[in-house]
């Protein structure tokens, strides 16, 4: 039924459009003993053309559970036992499935479970206690008398959900940021935001080692675009031979420590330059050099 209806609809619609255009192409005005023909310029029918726009759809959670959202956006939770336990208690099975990523956890949480949590007095009490600890922690600011510290590293091992590290150096750098936060040191860190991060290894059916990469969805990570007072995405740039390399700036909250991550994978760059922030320690020597220059 629908296939017949649709086909007939398209035929009728086409005839209607043809008749409409033929009527608007020429108009005759009676002027005494003759008819004056006025030609009109056919205008483009823009109303029948799709207009594509990018949009982000974010799942909202009940107002009573908003503290969970704020906690998920700051990596303070990952080295605070009470906060980790809080997220696990939201849905223990789902917590494991999303690799202990609280942002992904809240995104996949069902409305039924949200309603249950809103009516769970013990859970709400636990959440309020953790959130109070967090807000008190964040309210303490570094002394203005202390020197500011700028920390640069190719990798930061902060949590497994943020794949911008490979091993020892990254874990050490991540621990520096966490310790700086706990000691209330005025530190600002800078690194690169890798689209694919570092490879993981697996064995093929023949027993050979294979490297696999998985693209990160930046909007499912504890990072946010840095914007200026006009709402524009803050960028930085570096001169390269015959061109300019651009990088967008993202911000990751590591407790009280701000970590700024540079991302070259967007339309302003040539394809070869977009690959600068594809892989940690990936690509040829020239790409490695570009990474160092950008940082």
What are these regions (language model features)?
Residues 6-295:
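Catalytic cores of carbohydrate-active enzymes across secretory and cytosolic contexts
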Residues 1-3:
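A short, well-ordered alpha-helix in the C-terminal region of glycosyltransferases
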